[in-house]
Amino acid sequence: MTQDDQPDYRIPQGGGVPWRDMGMEETHRPPERDIEITAIETMAIAGNFTWGIVKVETDADVYGLGETFRAEAALDMAGRMEVDLEGENPLDTDRIRELLEQRYTGTGRIGQAAFTAIETACYDIKGKLFDVPVYELLGGKYRDEIKI
């Protein structure tokens, strides 16, 4: 591969996330393996403090759930991210992370909290589709029980 064949990675001025054209063909999954995000729903659950739940829905009639803290602001941010994620494949979590990092750099903890809930929901979708617990997707079980 020559230097001219390399993908275009650029560091934004002042640092930040390397830029890559997410429209490049190499960043897409083959159509026969496609599943798409169709909607993102958010809900707040009151308790000692407010928890946020994010539901990522797909065209395969499978949905995933993720949770977040800082519910009001993070849920608002997750709702705004829906526009960027509709049509994306929830199995491509690295691609989704890069896409959201590019578009939402500078949103701080709120942006990270929103993304983490979406990412968790995508892993939940993977677990359901592959019929394995999410901990298996993340490297396996570490322990069988914990002290409470």
Each predicted region: which residue ranges?
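A generic local secondary-structure boundary/capping motif
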Residues: 43, 137-138
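Subtilisin-like serine protease catalytic core
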Residues: 130, 140-141
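Metal- or metallocofactor-binding catalytic centers and their adjacent structured scaffolds
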Residues: 22-25, 40, 59-132
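Structured loop/turn residues at beta-strand edges in well-structured enzyme cores
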Residues: 35, 116, 144
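Hydrophobic faces of well-ordered beta-strands that scaffold small-molecule active sites
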Residues: 64, 144-148
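Structured beta-strand/loop patches that form or line metal/cofactor-binding pockets in enzymes
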Residues: 16-64
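Intrinsic disorder at enzyme termini
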Residues: 2-22
